[in-house]
């Protein structure tokens, strides 16, 4: 079924590409059609492979990047029209600021994981709730949102979901009554900062926007949306929350306290000091002119030295498939940008909006939200970054930063709509499935889609009113 839908989508796009190319005459007539069409097809094929989970997303990106380079060095040697992207251009297309920022934060979080602090946080959340399931859900959403803003939403979900499932089973409620609020809160909380969500990392690296800029501009709407989420989760799961599932709260607290405790207080103290140092460097980005990746890698190296953690073990904790995925994706998008496809997409947006700033803001946020629900928001954001750069140049009188906020809000909040919309959704669904609590695509949409729509309506109003 997935393959059939993917094939239909791919054929439809192949039919539409000539129409897209035909409208490119007014942008750059010097660019030959062959590399534009090939880079466009590769980009679409990779999207389809990722969106319908036909192969692992890292393998899909590797396939796309290697195809571009192979064609460029074989057919391109005989016909320059097939020189899609040179090897040097491919290396230049990779944003190593993003790669090293992710690597540094992965190392820091991996060391923190060994202290047991994340499991302890889950236990403390239940203790604060005093056995009240709805109160527990609110606390978990707040904790998840804050951790996602300070670390990143994928890591937060990876660490908290297994503990959340166990707590739900102890309380005898469906795990998804707690997992859903956590996923949604994670994506919303991650929106508030530069490092909270992978799309934000991509946007921040390309635009030069600082940690402070993200926090001050997106933090307020993240908080507003989180409050709306709390109300929506009660609407969807109130029956579960009202059930009296466990009358022996003191006994349960004793068990959780025994099992979910801080394993290494000294190491945790070191981690918190270093993490605080890194966050301070993020805040001082404008003054120091320091890239976030330098702050993250510096913190990771300091923590490795003072904690005396085995370097081999920590490198094993780095999510290399994710880093390779990003690098290959940069190459694919770089090829599409170099060969005129990205300006073509941007020109379509310009024509639809009539170069009106307000219309452009609305179009960017809603297209981003809709597309992020269909494909993972990471590859979509990577492909939209050059589009926004182009729009900032051709839309008269527009604040150059507002379209970045539009893209970030659309990609981050739109990702809540479906399982494949955001990496944190996929991670949580995978953990739940391995525990025997799989969720169907359509069941996820029933809750995720309303949350995404409400979030994007609030975001649109926020941007138009504030800016």
Predicted stretch roles:
Residues 2-23, 173-176, 180, 192-195, ...:
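Juxtamembrane and boundary regions of transmembrane helices in multi-pass small-molecule transporters
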Residues 6-10, 35-47, 54-83, 95-107, ...:
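Hydrophobic mid-bilayer segments of alpha-helices in multi-pass membrane transport proteins
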Residues 25-35, 52-58, 83-98, 211-221, ...:
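Interfacial loop-to-helix junctions that mark the boundaries of transmembrane helices
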Residues 27-41, 94-107, 149-157, 193, ...:
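Structural signature of hydrophobic alpha-helical transmembrane segments
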Residues 48-55, 143-152, 183-195, 284-287, ...:
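Transmembrane alpha-helix interface/packing and boundary motifs in multi-pass membrane proteins
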Residues 82-174, 320-394, 400:
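Membrane-embedded alpha-helical segments and adjacent helix-loop junctions characteristic
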Residues 122, 155-166, 179, 192-207, ...:
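Re-entrant/interfacial helical elements at transmembrane boundaries that shape
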Residues 226-310:
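Long, contiguous bundles of hydrophobic transmembrane helices that form the permeation core
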């Amino acid at each position: 079924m997935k393959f059939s839908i993917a094939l239909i989508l791919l054929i439809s796009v192949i039919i539409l590409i000539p129409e897209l190319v035909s409208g490119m005459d007014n942008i750059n007539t010097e660019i030959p059609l062959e590399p534009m069409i090939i880079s466009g097809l590769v980009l679409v094929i990779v999207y389809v492979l990722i969106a319908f989970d036909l192969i692992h997303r890292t393998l899909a990106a590797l396939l796309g990047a290697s195809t571009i380079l192979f064609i460029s060095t074989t057919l391109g040697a005989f016909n320059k029209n097939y020189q899609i992207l040179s090897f040097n251009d491919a290396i230049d297309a990779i944003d190593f600021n993003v790669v090293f920022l992710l690597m540094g934060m992965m190392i820091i979080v991996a060391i923190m994981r060994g202290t047991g602090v994340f499991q302890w946080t889950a236990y403390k959340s239940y203790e604060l709730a005093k056995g009240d399931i709805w109160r527990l859900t609110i606390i978990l959403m707040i904790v998840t949102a804050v951790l996602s803003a300070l670390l990143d939403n994928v890591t937060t979900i990876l660490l908290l979901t297994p503990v959340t499932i166990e707590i739900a089973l102890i309380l005898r409620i469906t795990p998804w009554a707690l997992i859903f609020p956590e996923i949604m809160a994670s994506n919303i909380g991650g929106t508030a900062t530069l490092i909270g969500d992978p799309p934000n990392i991509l946007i921040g690296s390309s635009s030069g926007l600082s940690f402070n800029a993200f926090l001050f501009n997106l933090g307020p709407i993240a908080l507003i949306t989180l409050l709306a989420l709390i109300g929506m989760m009660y609407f969807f799961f109130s029956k579960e929350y009202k059930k009296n599932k466990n009358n022996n709260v003191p006994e349960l607290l004793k068990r959780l306290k025994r099992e979910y405790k801080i394993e290494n207080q000294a190491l945790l103290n070191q981690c918190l000091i270093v993490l605080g140092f890194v966050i301070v460097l993020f805040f001082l980005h404008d003054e120091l002119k320091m890239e976030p990746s330098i702050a993250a890698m510096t913190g990771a190296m300091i923590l490795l030295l003072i904690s005396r953690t085995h370097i081999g073990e920590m490198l094993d904790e780095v999510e290399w498939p994710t880093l390779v995925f990003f690098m290959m994706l940069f190459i694919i998008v770089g090829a599409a940008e170099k060969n005129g496809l990205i300006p073509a997409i941007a020109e379509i947006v310009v024509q639809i909006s009539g170069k009106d700033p307000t219309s452009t803001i609305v179009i960017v946020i809603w297209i981003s939200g809709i597309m992020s629900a269909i494909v993972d928001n990471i590859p979509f954001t990577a492909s939209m970054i050059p589009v926004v750069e182009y729009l900032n140049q051709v839309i008269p009188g527009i604040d150059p930063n507002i379209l970045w906020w539009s893209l970030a809000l659309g990609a981050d909040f739109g990702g809540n709509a479906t399982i494949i919309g955001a990496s944190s959704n996929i991670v949580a669904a995978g953990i739940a499935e391995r525990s025997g609590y799989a969720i169907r695509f359509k069941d996820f949409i029933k809750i995720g889609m309303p949350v995404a729509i409400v979030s994007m309506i609030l975001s649109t109003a926020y941007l138009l009113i504030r800016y």
